[in-house]
Amino acid sequence: MHYVYIIQSLNYPDQIYVGCTTDLKKRMSNHNSGTTSHTEKYKPWKLVVYLAFEDKAKAYVFEEYLKSGSGRAFRNKRLL
């Protein structure tokens, strides 16, 4: 399974991160331990939503969509 996930900083609620992984628990641990350079400044993080995909390509396409302008609007209106 491939997971597209959205996390939100507990200390900086305006900071949202979208990612894709096959091991959600390990990835959340990485974000909260500071081993992920892009997110270490805003830790700790909480998992807001995740979606499971069987197809890796579809997961990465959806992740890219959520990072686009219209995808951010969709995310903010429907997922957060």
Task: Report residues per predicted region.
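GIY-YIG nuclease catalytic motif and its immediate N-terminal context
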Residues: 1-37, 43, 47-67, 72, ...
